Amino acid sequence: MFRVLVSDKMSNDGLQPLIESDFIEIVQKNVADAEDELHTFDALLVRSATKVTEDLFNKMTSLKIVGRAGVGVDNIDIDEATKHGVIVINAPNGNTISTAEHTFAMISSLMRHIPQANISVKSREWNRTAYVGSELYGKTLGIVGLGRIGSEIAQRARAFGMTVHVFDPFLTEERAKKIGVNSRTFEEVLESADIITVHTPLTKETKGLLNKETIAKTKKGVRLINCARGGIIDEAALLEALENGHVAGAALDVFEVEPPVDNKLVDHPLVIATPHLGASTKEAQLNVAAQVSEEVLQFAKGLPVMSAINLPAMTKDEFAKIKPYHQIAGKIGSLVSQCMKEPVQDVAIQYEGTIAKLETSFITKALLSGFLKPRVDSTVNEVNAGGVAKERGISFSEKISSSESGYDNCISVKVTGDRSTFTVTATYIPHFGERIVEINGFNIDFYPTGHLVYIQHQDTTGVIGRVGRILGDNDINIATMQVGRKEKGGEAIMMLSFDRHLEDKIVKELTNVPDIVSVKLIDLP
């Protein structure tokens, strides 16, 4: 049974994919109430209230995936998640329309003084001259960050007859033309816009993006909107600009500290403030819960997730193409690790053929994960394999090869240790499956699975016969045997597979055979 803890309030309709599944148990409790059973959950679903910290990861020892029902993941320690091998997903599309509409409602309210006029009328006043506003038509809207939400806002602004100037370092001219916006530098947006709205994540680069210095570059009378993340606008700088008259008004849905207590900015008469309502519509709450539920269900079935924060994103079709190589990469990593009983400094991976056009970083991490699992006593998977390798002083690299091996696709790995190097080449052949086709320069062909024995020996008469006799005397049936050599009478290798694991005494007997150099036991899934 795959156990899911839902620690924040979510739409039950959105959770239906999990509720209806016959192999998933869903528990709706906050973290404190679930304290005694935290170690039993495979998945955790949160909104913004639950803080997913190092301490929580340490308690949730079975945790494999965290789903954030929303876009922002500020409340989740992504580095700790990665370190613990936990995938973090979000719902990047679920609240796009809701947030875009809220942003535009804030813009309209700010331009027409709607909240202030509403309070005035309810106070039995009728002061029309005090609330003369400005039209949106003909104004320039500056958008900082043209992601999904920014694009929806641009579309609505154009419908109001506004000119839209956008700063986004990843915006191409082609996309700008398609959306109908003007691509500008950040400074150009500051200088030209009548209204500026920010739609970026909160990062080291965007924290305080609109500060005393940058606000001073804006038009006098500019209006500023933040429905993205608290901290993108420096609140102290904004308050100063409102008080000196440079900024004509601000609409804020997010704050540096939430809820904002004793906040002079919130109290300012030219500020419209809402309590982080961007995603607070019935439709958005249903959408984000449904999106993360579907993703967690996919994960529980062993299928790829589309919105992982700390893994490469890929579609089902892309995953279908990559899956065979992902599986064999983990196996060859494990094979090398079990054969090299020495400290390792470097893992170099090479891709050849059409596989090189796929998301090779995912395959690389699968290989690293397979390599590290026999060597460490902590959780290792594709999420944290790179970090675990670096912690242990193991460098890794990947490159694309243009050489011809005779196979449509190949993965090769060269592992460098204190005393030796080890190389393996593998491929996947449709209808025939996974194959190891080279080990340490020896051509060979075998299916990497189950109980294996890798033998290095001299190519002399009788070695194979003596190996067979020892195994037969111990009632061991050989499932498959492959041999490889470079030249007659020189070094050779033998790879055998069995239906069960070999006992140590049999390995010792094999090791004592004349002309056998080494015997390595390998167990693969």
UniProtKB/Swiss-Prot annotation:
CDD domains: ACT_3PGDH-xct, PGDH_4
Positions bound to NAD(+): R148, I149, D168, T200, C227, A228, R229, D253, H276, L277, G278, A279
Keywords, sorted A to Z: Amino-acid biosynthesis, NAD, Oxidoreductase, Serine biosynthesis
The protein's annotated pathway: Amino-acid biosynthesis; L-serine biosynthesis; L-serine from 3-phospho-D-glycerate: step 1/3
EC category name: oxidoreductase
Domain spans labelled ACT: 452-524
UniProt catalytic activity: (2R)-3-phosphoglycerate + NAD(+) = 3-phosphooxypyruvate + NADH + H(+); (R)-2-hydroxyglutarate + NAD(+) = 2-oxoglutarate + NADH + H(+)
SUPFAM superfamilies listed in its UniProt record: ACT-like (SSF55021), Formate/glycerate dehydrogenase catalytic domain-like (SSF52283), NAD(P)-binding Rossmann-fold domains (SSF51735), Serine metabolism enzymes domain (SSF143548)
Family to which the UniProt record says this protein belongs: Belongs to the D-isomer specific 2-hydroxyacid dehydrogenase family.
Protein name: D-3-phosphoglycerate dehydrogenase
Organism from which the protein derives: Bacillus subtilis (strain 168)
Phylogenetic lineage: Bacteria, Bacillati, Bacillota, Bacilli, Bacillales
